[in-house]
């Protein structure tokens, strides 16, 4: 079995065998040159130091894992009791990929994240990004039922 982190920061740290330094931005302690060194060795591709190019390289590598995975395992920001829906908030789109491309999706979360109805969810979804990153809303809000 191969486990692959899909959050970009966590993916970089997994490749580097390095612990996270921040809960929201886990690889913030690494320079782009350090990330480039890791990608060159682990991806076995020519070294790049341009950030858009490195992001594209990571997307290409991760997409291969998404489409061949038998199972995607994620957390959930919220679960709706009324519908059985899971809600995942990301800024990279990895939540949608891990919940839809693998044959099986397993969401693991605590009871404190269960909300009664979709209406209750609408209130909480506006609060989450403001308190986590200061954003009005995250780039990707994925609800899966």
Task: Report residues per predicted region.
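The feature marks the mature, well-folded catalytic cores of soluble enzymes
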Residues: 1-145
């Amino acid at each position: 079995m191969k486990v692959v982190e899909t959050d970009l920061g966590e993916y970089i740290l997994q490749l580097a065998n390095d612990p996270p330094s921040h809960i929201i931005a886990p690889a913030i302690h690494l320079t782009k040159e350090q990330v480039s060194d890791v990608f060159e060795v682990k991806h076995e591709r020519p070294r790049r130091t341009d950030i858009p190019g490195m992001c594209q390289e990571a997307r290409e590598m991760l997409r291969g894992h998404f489409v061949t995975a038998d199972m995607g395992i994620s957390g959930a920001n919220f679960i709706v009791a009324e519908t059985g829906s899971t809600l995942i908030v990301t800024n990279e789109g990895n939540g949608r990929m891990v919940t839809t491309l693998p044959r099986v999706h397993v969401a693991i979360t605590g009871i404190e994240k269960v909300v009664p109805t979709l209406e209750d969810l609408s209130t909480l979804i506006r609060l989450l990004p403001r308190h986590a990153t200061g954003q009005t809303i995250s780039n990707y809000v994925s609800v899966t039922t």
